[in-house]
Amino acid sequence: MGMRMMFTVFLLVVLATTVVSFMSGRASHGRNAAASDLIALTIKGCCSVPPCIANHPELCV
């Protein structure tokens, strides 16, 4: 392989890695949002229970 061919292959590998990394990062945003919603619902549940409010008042501000 010549230098140009090796450089071209290198650029293609970098591009493919970047695209895969970008797409997998995007896919995880939905999972993170779902986890955040679950945490928010749990905290709201805690705020409706007096003993939980007493133990964790910072959550119910």
UniProtKB/Swiss-Prot annotation:
InterPro entries on file: Conotoxin_a-typ
Statement: the UniProt record of this protein carries the keyword Transit peptide: no
Keywords: Acetylcholine receptor inhibiting toxin, Disulfide bond, Neurotoxin, Postsynaptic neurotoxin, Secreted, Signal, Toxin
Propeptide: 22-44
Localization: Secreted
Gene Ontology cellular-component annotations: extracellular region; host cell postsynaptic membrane
Pfam families, per database record: Toxin_8 (PF07365)
GO terms of molecular function: acetylcholine receptor inhibitor activity; toxin activity
Tissues showing expression: Expressed by the venom duct.
Tree of life domain: Eukaryota
Signal sequence region: 1-21
Keyword Disulfide bond part of the UniProt annotation: yes
Post-translational modification: Is not hydroxylated.
Summary of the function given for this chain in its UniProt record: Alpha-conotoxins act on postsynaptic membranes, they bind to the nicotinic acetylcholine receptors (nAChR) and thus inhibit them.
UniProt comment concerning the protein's domains: The cysteine framework is I (CC-C-C). Alpha4/7 pattern.
Family classification: Belongs to the conotoxin A superfamily.
Entry protein name: Alpha-conotoxine-like Am1.4
Species in which this protein is naturally found: Conus amadis (Amadis cone)
Classification lineage: Eukaryota, Metazoa, Spiralia, Lophotrochozoa, Mollusca
